[in-house]
C-alpha cells in the first residue's frame, strides 16, 4: 500500500524488490525493521530476505512460488484462523529480542509532527475533540502488560500461505507490544465476523492458557480499545500520505467512521 514492488528474475531465481517512497523514510525506522525482519526469518515466520538496507529501506525478498496472500474469506474460516493462531503463539512466545517498542501513541505523535496542515485532523469531523480526548485516555493501556514481540501490521496482504505453511511478511511496524494488538489488527483488517473474532480470541487464549474467564472478558474490552486506537492512527497516517500527493480514495473516511463506531462501544 505504501511501497513499489517489482518482481525480478536473477539467474533463474525470482525475487521481489521493494522500493519505498520518500515519505516512508520519515515514517519507518528501517534499522528496527531490518533487525526484526532477520529474527523473524530465523524463527521460520518470515520469508528469506537477502537484502534490507537500513538507510534506504530497499528490500530484496525471495519470491515464494505457489503462494498466495490470505483473503478476508479465508480469514473468516476456523481452519485458517487456527493456523494464524499457531504463528501468533510462536511469535509472541519467541525468544526474540526486539530493540524497539511499538506504541500507537508515539507513532501518532510522530505522524502528527509530520502533518503540515494540523487542521486536516481536527476539522475532519465535528466530533474530533471527543475522539482525540478518548484516544489519549488509553495511553497507559499497556502499562501493566508484559510486552512481547509483535508484528503490528497483520493485514491479510501480510499473511502469505505456501502449501500448508504460513508466513508473516513486511515487518515495518514490528516491535514489542501487547499480543492482543496483533489479534485486534486481524479482526479489524480482515473484517472478521463476530463468530470468527470470538473463535480467534478463544483459540489463542486456549493455546496460550493465559486467560481465565474474568481475564477473557477484559481481553474483549482491550481488543476494542486497540481497534479504536488503530483506526485513529491509520486515519492520521493517511492524511500525512495525502499531503504528499498519494491518493487513498475514501480510505481515511472509512478509518474515521470505524473509529467513531468503536468509540460508541468502548467501556
From Swiss-Prot:
GO terms for cellular component: cytoplasm. GO terms for molecular function: ethanolamine kinase activity. It holds the Pfam family Choline_kinase. GO terms for biological process: phosphatidylethanolamine biosynthetic process. InterPro entries: CcrZ_PhaseVar_Mediator (IPR052077), Kinase-like_dom_sf (IPR011009). Gene3D superfamilies: 3.90.1200.10, Phosphorylase Kinase, domain 1 (3.30.200.20). Belongs to the peptidase S49 family. Mediates phase variation of the LPS epitopes. Phase variation of H.influenza LPS epitopes expressed by LicA is determined by a translational switch. Lipopolysaccharide (LPS) is a glycolipid that is a necessary component and antigenic determinant of the outer membrane and has been shown to be an important factor in the host-parasite interaction in a number of Gram-negative species. This is Protein LicA. It comes from Haemophilus influenzae (strain ATCC 51907 / DSM 11121 / KW20 / Rd).
Amino acid at each position: 500500500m505504501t511501497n513499489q514492488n517489482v518482481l525480478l528474475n536473477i539467474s533463474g531465481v525470482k525475487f521481489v524488490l521493494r522500493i519505498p517512497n520518500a515519505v516512508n523514510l520519515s515514517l519507518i525506522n528501517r534499522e528496527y525493521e531490518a533487525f526484526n525482519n532477520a529474527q523473524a526469518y530465523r524463527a521460520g515466520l518470515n520469508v528469506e530476505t537477502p537484502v534490507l538496507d537500513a538507510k534506504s529501506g530497499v528490500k530484496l525478498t525471495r519470491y515464494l512460488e505457489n503462494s498466495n496472500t490470505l483473503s478476508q474469506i479465508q480469514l473468516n474460516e476456523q481452519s485458517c484462523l487456527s493456523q494464524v493462531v499457531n504463528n501468533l503463539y510462536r511469535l509472541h512466545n519467541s525468544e526474540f529480542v526486539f530493540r524497539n517498542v511499538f506504541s500507537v501513541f508515539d507513532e501518532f505523535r510522530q505522524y502528527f509532527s509530520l502533518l503540515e496542515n494540523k487542521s486536516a485532523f481536527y476539522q475532519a469531523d465535528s466530533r474530533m475533540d471527543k475522539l482525540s480526548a478518548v484516544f489519549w485516555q488509553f495511553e497507559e493501556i499497556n502499562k501493566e502488560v508484559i510486552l512481547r514481540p509483535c508484528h503490528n501490521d497483520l493485514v491479510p496482504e501480510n499473511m502469505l500461505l505456501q502449501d500448508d505453511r504460513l508466513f508473516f511478511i513486511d515487518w515495518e511496524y514490528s516491535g514489542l507490544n501487547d499480543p492482543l494488538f496483533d489479534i485486534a489488527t486481524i479482526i479489524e483488517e480482515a473484517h472478521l465476523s463476530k463468530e470468527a473474532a470470538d473463535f480467534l480470541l478463544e483459540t489463542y487464549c486456549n493455546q496460550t492458557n493465559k486467560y481465565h474467564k474474568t481475564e477473557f472478558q477484559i481481553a474483549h474490552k482491550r481488543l476494542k480499545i486497540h481497534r479504536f486506537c488503530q483506526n485513529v492512527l491509520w486515519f492520521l497516517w493517511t492524511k500525512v500520505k495525502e499531503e504528499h500527493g498519494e491518493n487513498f480514495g475514501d480510505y481515511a473516511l472509512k478509518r474515521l467512521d470505524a473509529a467513531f463506531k468503536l468509540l460508541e462501544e468502548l467501556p
